Amino acid sequence: MDLVSASQSYFKRIFQEVSDLKILLLEEDTTKIVSSCITQSNLLEQQIYLTVLLGNKREKLRHLKCVAFLRPTPTTLRLLCEELRDPKYAEYHLYFTNVIPKSFLERLAESDDFEAVKSIQEFFLDYLVVNNDLASFNIPHIIEDSPDNWQDGAFHRTHQGIISLLLSLKKKPVIRYDNNSLLCLKLAEEVSYTIQHESQLFNFRKPDTAPILLLLDRKNDPITPLLTQWTYQAMVHELFGIDNGRVSFSNSTSDNEKSTEIVLNPTLDPFYKETRFDNFGDLGVKIKDYVSHLQTKSTKKASEIESIADMKQFLEAYPEYRRLSGNVSKHVSLVSEISQVVQRENLLEVGEVEQSLVCNEPQSTDFNDIQRLLFSNISENTKLRLAALYSLRFERIDPAKVSALQQMLIAGGVNPLKVSVIPTLLHVAGYSFRQGDVFPPSNLFSRARSGLKGLRGVENVYIQHNPFLKSILLDLIQGRLKETTHPFLNSETRAQTSNEKPQDIIVVIVGGATYEEAHFVSEFNATQPGVRIILAGTTILNSTAYIDDIMYMSTRIK
Amino acid sequence: MAYRDRTGLYITFRQSYSHHGQRLELSGWDPKEERQSLVHKDNKDNTVIEMDMLAPRWVTVEGEIDSLLLNTRRNINLLDKQYAKHVLPSFSDKTEQENEIQRLTIQITQDFQRCQKLLQVTKAQTNSATGSEALMAKNFLSNLASRIQTESAQFRKKQSTYLKKLRGLNANISPVESKLDETVSDVAISQSTIQQVALMEEQGEDEQAIRHERAVAKIAEGIIELAQMFQDLQVLVIEQGALVDRIDFNIEQTQVHAKSAEKELIKAESHQKNTGRLRFICFLILLIVALIVILAIKLLR
């Protein structure tokens, strides 16, 4: 159950099977997939000196063998048929990321006049590898015209993603889903149908306890994607956005205002791998150590280095050294940029208010805090987030204030169009549309507990919040997850498995997962012996992406 | 990682289509063929050699470098054994061993330098390449450079450990110490070694000792040369984990290049069109002038 090793073994196999000089033929979607798994230097090591896109104009290079890594879509089929009628390369080895329909094969065979195709295989890698336990299907919007209705393309893509995820991990799961979500039900039925239909493919050795595919709907936890994040990976995504491992941010400290683009890949960058779940405070300490590590290396070994000019010269002279220093300076500039934004957006205060809003008992002072922040000098997005969180929290307690808040947003200079996000959010993910409670239940016991917490002193006020997913997973691991909220798709499987404690769990969040949830999944994997969890989302959300998605919904829902 | 091979099914489908007659026709027996000469007598009927069927010439360099690297690896192993023997304390004469070590060291260093030379030659050859061939050549060189770099770095590491042992320095380097320290120190150590030999010669020390130190200095020189080479190769090598190491980034880059090339082409085209038009206008003006002159002459008469 490791996505990085699964994906890399696929590529290892491809490279073993085709020898000699090769050209790699991709399309836009698979370019993203390939880039999330391997690097350019990996390709060069395998004598792949050219990488081209199927849709582009290309020269004939018939001394090369072609390795094609493609998704089985109608567009690909059309382009590939054209290609085969006039082959540009010596031979074709086709690898598809998913199950190929028979009709697809037939049409391809029909066009293959020159018998250029030497092999066709299905390598199930139809998702982006983000962490070794986090995958993304890279679909920003999934809803058609009501919150319960899939957009066709998105549905198909998600379904394919899940099938390939299961096959690449060699799992034939029992399916559980959010009972209140029609999106999840439809997806569960389709996945289950494919598993039965392709029984030959899903013919794996039966494990002692059946793996579980848990389909969740984002609407049951609209809180997590709206919160300010305080761990490294999540923070970078929240503030700048991680696009398939690439981050671009404008470097305000450097002279030119041009934005810098960097790569964050936990498999290639040991420092990032180690610190991605650290909170901002610990991160600062680690960064400092990292820099001083570089410093001691330079001073200890080459004592003649004294000035910065010496240092620069030294770095130029020793390329291996430059690699480390490049990485150090990458993280230093990223972290310094983060702290700039934290200050500019007053995120420390915002974060505190947010956390008390979602973790503590509702208090009347919350409104004043929010009000103060709405008229302070912070960005539109932050204001919207705060208002959205307040609205979700006080939706039933104080509806008057919730609507007053929307007026205040407009008065505070937020685009009225964007303010419409809040009613839509309440319509999609409001109290009556959710199951379970993302907020701590308000009863005497919890009040006593929060009182106790106050006495003991909270360890870190900024990271009190636990995503709803955590409690679901805890229940599931202990075999306590209720069937009323998360039923099995097939009732016969229930009898065998209902009381078992599952070992392998694949969680798919329809509507997008977050890095905060990924953090907790990683923590589970590290601390719970015998339990292995993989998290996947239709996309990886940050607050901007989530608000965008809600905006998109508000234009579509009738 | 499950996978499924569909080649068999695909070939069955392919065979069921009749279009494969085309291929049969080509290979079918043709009575005319008997009387055809091997070389066309008719000069007009030039045989076409399709260039895209042939790999570019520089691809063969890879084989050469492969065999050189293989050779060095074998030599490095031999050298390892000699080193192990040499550092063992014994009273017997070590001159022969030292000579062997020296010979191997020089051989390896030369091989590495030959590799580098080959690369440079290839680089010069491919400078004129265009389009995808240029890109391919660049990637090709970068791969070879990084391979040579890794091999030579390993060799240097071994050499500097040996050198440290010889010079009685602290040879127990902890394994956690990264390659980085090695590079920094191996050059420094080599430099100081060479200086020391020079110093000894000046002071006119015992000939035996000088001879020994000179042998050591030879190794040190080799290290410095290789360090220099490492630097030169760095220009070609892709930094791992950097943006240039991303596959999508590279594809984007080539697309940008292609687009800008296209733009240039359009510009050039319109430019050419314009010059044609301009020429035509000039021609017309000249014609008019000429006609006026003719008219004037006629009127004057």
Curated annotation (Swiss-Prot), chain A:
Keywords linked to the UniProt accession: Cytoplasm, Membrane, Nucleus, Protein transport, Transport, Vacuole
Q: What are the record's GO terms for cellular component?
A: cytosol; endosome; Golgi membrane; nucleus; vacuolar membrane
GO:BP terms for this protein?
Golgi vesicle fusion to target membrane; intracellular protein transport; vesicle-mediated transport
Q: Its membrane topology, per UniProt?
A: Peripheral membrane protein
Question: Its Gene Ontology molecular function terms?
Answer: SNARE binding
The record's listing under InterPro entries reads:
Sec-1-like_dom1 (IPR043154), Sec-1-like_dom3a (IPR043127), Sec1-like (IPR001619), Sec1-like_dom2 (IPR027482), Sec1-like_sf (IPR036045)
Entry's SUPFAM superfamilies?
A: Sec1/munc18-like (SM) proteins
Report the locations given in the UniProt record: Cytoplasm; Nucleus; Vacuole membrane
Null allele outcome, as annotated, is: displays an accumulation of abnormal vesicular structures and leads to valproic acid sensitivity.
Family statement: Belongs to the STXBP/unc-18/SEC1 family.
Explain the purpose of this protein.
Answer: Vacuolar protein sorting-associated protein involved in Golgi-to-vacuole protein transport.
Protein name, as recorded: Vacuolar protein sorting-associated protein 45
UniProt lists the gene as vps45
Curated annotation (Swiss-Prot), chain B:
Domain t-SNARE coiled-coil homology: from-to ranges: 206-268
Q: Please list the coiled coil stretches.
A: 92-120
Keyword NAD applies: no
User: Which residue spans belong to the Vesicular compartment?
Assistant: 301
Q: Indicate how the chain sits in the lipid bilayer.
A: Single-pass type IV membrane protein
Q: Which UniProt keywords apply?
A: Coiled coil, Endosome, Golgi apparatus, Membrane, Protein transport, Transmembrane, Transmembrane helix, Transport
GO CC annotations on file:
cytosol; endomembrane system; endosome membrane; Golgi apparatus; SNARE complex
Question: GO MF annotations for this entry?
Answer: SNAP receptor activity; SNARE binding
Q: Which GO terms describe its biological process?
A: intracellular protein transport; vesicle docking; vesicle fusion
The membrane spanning regions, by residue number, are 280-300
User: Main localisation, per the record?
Assistant: Golgi
Q: Which domain of life is it from?
A: Eukaryota
Subcellular location field: Golgi apparatus, trans-Golgi network membrane; Endosome membrane
Function noted in UniProt: t-SNARE that functions in transport from the endosome to the late Golgi and on the endocytic pathway.
Question: According to its UniProt record, which protein family does this protein belong to?
Answer: Belongs to the syntaxin family.
Q: What is this protein called?
A: t-SNARE affecting a late Golgi compartment protein 2
Q: Which organism is it from?
A: Schizosaccharomyces pombe (strain 972 / ATCC 24843)
Per the record, the gene is tlg2
